[in-house]
């Protein structure tokens, strides 16, 4: 198995952050990202880039981090207890975009690389990541194009890759207490190292670069749609699910908090405005009801193309 080239991974991640920010600024057309670099006392640091109050994007955050620590946190060893006590090095790019327009979906993407080391033993390394889409007023055309882009980028790596990581995404971004998915899914992968470093790194690059190819056309299709206070209030209500998932279930959020990461960067994924409403149910036959009845249930979208 080829050894890991951490320098190459870091350079790719830094370039990816820059490229995605440039693409999002071009889409928005008005606002620009503000960058803030930070250091972590235990080792490492990162750069957070945040765009706020744009023409299209209420808030978009694209974060790069490269952190080191003497002992793996509980969130990283829960499903791999054999790694407990190892030192670690983690780097990645994570982003969340909260649009103004309820017809443009919220989205999240992440690509990351992890090494766990112990004296006298070979390092254990792996890649992870993915991207997912959270519409408020879904259009089937958008969901299909999103999944088609995901399937196309997976295809060179094997026909089993897209179905496997699509299902993993559906399973991961699920809120048990609501019995619904967070959105319409996408891709999610972790512990990727079986094919060796070069092939695993190539897949991570494909996912990172494929994200904006999947998201930008959806933004372009929906950015001119007009909306009113009713749609805005439903968007704010549904954003509550994002908060619930990230604070209760998300491994990345828990990892950041447990390793003493930069809180502002970790919670950058939170929407700037959100609301809860006791006992809310959408009106029967409404487009809001269709979200619950059709879209928040895992399904084979590409069969419907």
UniProtKB/Swiss-Prot annotation:
Gene of this entry: hemF
Name of the protein this chain belongs to: Oxygen-dependent coproporphyrinogen-III oxidase
Residues with site note (Important for dimerization): 177
The keyword Methyltransferase appears for this protein: no
Binding residue positions for a divalent metal cation: 98, 108, 147, 177
GO molecular function: coproporphyrinogen oxidase activity; metal ion binding; protein homodimerization activity
EC number(s) per entry: 1.3.3.3
Cellular component, GO annotation: cytoplasm
NCBIfam families named among the record's database cross-references: PRK05330.1 (NF003727)
Reactions catalysed, as given in the entry: coproporphyrinogen III + O2 + 2 H(+) = protoporphyrinogen IX + 2 CO2 + 2 H2O
Keywords assigned by UniProt, alphabetized: Cytoplasm, Heme biosynthesis, Metal-binding, Oxidoreductase, Porphyrin biosynthesis
Pfam families per record: Coprogen_oxidas
Pathway, per record: Porphyrin-containing compound metabolism; protoporphyrin-IX biosynthesis; protoporphyrinogen-IX from coproporphyrinogen-III (O2 route): step 1/1
PROSITE patterns (alphabetical): COPROGEN_OXIDASE
């Amino acid at each position: 198995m080829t050894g890991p080239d951490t320098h190459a991974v870091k350079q790719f991640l830094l370039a990816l952050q820059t490229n995605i920010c440039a693409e999002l600024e071009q889409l928005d057309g008005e606002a620009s990202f503000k960058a803030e670099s930070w250091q972590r006392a235990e080792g490492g640091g990162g750069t957070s880039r945040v765009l706020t109050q744009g023409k299209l994007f209420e808030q978009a955050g694209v974060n790069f981090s490269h952190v080191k620590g003497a002992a793996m946190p509980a969130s990283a060893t829960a499903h791999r207890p054999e790694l407990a006590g190892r030192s670690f090095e983690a780097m990645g790019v994570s982003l969340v975009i909260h649009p103004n327009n309820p017809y443009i979906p919220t989205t999240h993407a992440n690509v990351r690389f992890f090494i766990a080391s112990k004296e006298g033993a070979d390092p254990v390394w792996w890649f992870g990541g993915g991207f997912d889409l959270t519409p408020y007023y879904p259009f089937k055309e958008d969901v299909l194009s999103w999944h088609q882009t995901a399937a196309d980028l997976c295809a060179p790596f094997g026909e089993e890759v897209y179905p496997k990581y699509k299902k993993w995404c559906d399973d991961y971004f699920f809120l048990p207490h609501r019995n619904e998915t967070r959105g319409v899914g996408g891709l999610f992968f972790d512990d990727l190292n079986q094919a060796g470093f070069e092939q695993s790194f190539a897949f991570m690059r494909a996912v990172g670069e494929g994200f904006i190819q999947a998201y930008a056309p959806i933004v372009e299709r929906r950015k001119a749609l007009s909306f009113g206070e009713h749609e805005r209030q439903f968007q704010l209500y549904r954003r509550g699910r994002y908060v619930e998932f990230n604070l209760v279930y998300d491994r990345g959020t828990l990892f950041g908090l447990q390793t003493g990461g930069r809180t502002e960067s970790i919670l950058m994924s939170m929407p700037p405005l959100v609301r809860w409403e006791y006992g809310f149910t959408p009106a029967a036959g409404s487009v809001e009801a269709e979200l619950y009845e059709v879209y928040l249930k895992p399904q084979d979208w590409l069969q419907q193309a």
